């Protein structure tokens, strides 16, 4: 998993260096594979605004732009061949003397006889994305003349960790923040997921035909969305630094919540759903997936279906037919708990390993689904407008995982650790890890593990480690 150090520090910010943070995380058993800067070395790139555009006198594919944002507030003349160059947009502007990634120096030059005092940049030229279709259009409120590194908060590091299968709870910013908070006895600020009131009555029915495989399914209808709105730059940057490509607001929001909270989600085009949602085992049926491949989904695979067809491979990948697009106005958000034993191995069998399957087969917090859908709803409405219906929760409580009750004996703990730790320190550490104290007597204590720690079920040996 890749994550942005600055994103993590928004939740927990101990007074330690990047090197010390990496060492701590590694010593805690979350092996760090790589640390790299969030942006390649560059200088002299600022936020520019195109003030005027004229056709180049001697080149059909070139235009002459007057650009604000240069030194001392003066406008600079730039010759540009990007098809989206137009008046009013804000773009990265490399002034004369700038250095771009790859040791590319920007100099004053003539292009087909017209003076050019710098360069307007796209994402690929700055090595900050893979969109090579033209200029990188920045948000309208980007302050002209501001250094791009400052504006995008690029003074950051991307840290990649390799987690053991039993620590799926750390596959999110929230989970990592908990660990760092424990290691440093630092306060952790968790993202609030306040309920978003329903403003319409629209909902879908949900039927759990395989409750042992899907014990909780949470859905929410949102209507009247404008999915042509751009994903906010801050969200795109957090996704990029996590190794996730921006694909439009609906998909970006679900990916963002996955990274932030650890709950995989999916967005369906509501108009493509026939009747209600049915969570069932497959019927050896064909399904075209979001990656344009077609698979035959076998009877041992859980699917999300409607009244007439399979819509998605549960916990792995959505189907193409119900995918959202720019013209989608109404969606159904899905946030579910799938049994890890049902998902495990399926992604590999179909050759479809995804961020969602990676988390579901390791175990997702069974109490997270409603909070995640509220968080996604708030973000979606903020970006694209619209109206949300009520949250629909269908569950089979008997099939949901139960938190383990664990008894620790002080003498046994000291024997296994090889050192005696004061009971107050043990209690503090366990509380920070999310455990709840049931009782303490003279010889030890009894605790209930948090819903996100599937690994705390093996008794004293596991907890002593």
What is the predicted function of each stretch?
Residues 180-211, 383-413, 417-420, 459:
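Terminal amphipathic helices with adjacent charged low-complexity linkers/tails
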Residues 2-8, 156-164, 215-223, 355-363, ...:
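Short, hydrophobic beta-strand segments
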Residues 1-200, 332, 348-351, 355, ...:
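Phosphate-backbone binding interfaces of nucleic-acid-interacting proteins
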Residues 49-77, 236-237, 254-321:
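Conserved mixed alpha/beta core segments that line enzyme active sites in large multi-domain catalysts
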Residues 5, 23, 63, 184, ...:
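Glycine/proline-enriched, intrinsically flexible loops and inter-domain linkers
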Residues 38, 396-465:
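Noncatalytic alpha-helical scaffolds and linker/capping helices
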